[in-house]
Amino acid sequence: MSGHSKWHNIQGRKNAQDAKRGKVFQKLSREIYMAAKSGGPDPLGNPRLRLAVDKARAANMPKDNIQRAIKKAEGNSDEHYDEVTYEGYAPGGVAILVEALTDNKNRTASSVRVAFTRNGGSLGATGSVAYMFDRKGYIVIDRSTTDADEDQMLMDVMEAGGDDLQTSDDAYEIYTDAKSFTAVRDALEKAGYQLAVSELTMVPQNTTPVPADKKEQFEKLVDALEDDDDVSNVYTAAADEEE
């Protein structure tokens, strides 16, 4: 694996997300609602809902908000959202994937297209960049919550079935095959680890450095996409600055 660190990016964007907390919770509520609507209200029997709830908890979404979204799905609400993926290139030729949950595909497609166009990117056709990413399980353990050293952590990750362990001063990052993610997550929790993040994500097979003269425009594009009410996730193949 490339050594691409999602945790570095997550931490780097945390303050910006905190400022948009209301919008983040609204998006998470939508994900929880659709997961519960399609697979039932019990996270233990609904893997998609478990993922949505874990994601909400990682974002410090209040328990009442989570329960409200599940209750709404159990009720008579006829709201429906479609999952849509958009693909393209950011400034500097960096591949970018956008996942959305929308009740109006035309509106969302238009908004995403405008974001790309206004910020130096180009929206591509379906399949234009998706093949450059792999679906992976992603787990983060904050090192302040465990006494395990790197050797112990590696042993436990391998025993649980994880594919890759990356370490930094503040966190252990674990990547798994998408199909084995649930088993790895459950095994690590059973071993007593507290998981700061546990999710399915898209990981680039290779990363591309963002040219210095394109960095500001690149960040504006990502911000514009993440600000869209319908956009759930934005994945890029941008190399970390330290790579």
Swiss-Prot record:
Coiled-coil segments on the chain, per record: none
Gene Ontology molecular function terms on file: DNA binding
Keywords: Cytoplasm, DNA-binding, Transcription, Transcription regulation
Family: Belongs to the TACO1 family.
A Pfam family assignment: TACO1_YebC_N
Species whose genome carries this gene: Lactobacillus delbrueckii subsp. bulgaricus (strain ATCC 11842 / DSM 20081 / BCRC 10696 / JCM 1002 / NBRC 13953 / NCIMB 11778 / NCTC 12712 / WDCM 00102 / Lb 14)
PANTHER family named among the record's database cross-references: TRANSCRIPTIONAL REGULATORY PROTEIN YEBC-RELATED, TRANSLATIONAL ACTIVATOR OF CYTOCHROME C OXIDASE 1
GO cellular component, one term: cytosol
Keyword Glycosyltransferase included in the entry's annotation: no
InterPro entries from the UniProt entry: Integrase-like_N (IPR017856), TACO1_YebC-like_2nd/3rd_dom (IPR048300), TACO1_YebC_N (IPR049083), Transcrip_reg_TACO1-like (IPR002876), Transcrip_reg_TACO1-like_dom3 (IPR026564), YebC-like (IPR029072)
Protein name: Probable transcriptional regulatory protein Ldb0677
Region (Disordered), start-end ranges: 1-22
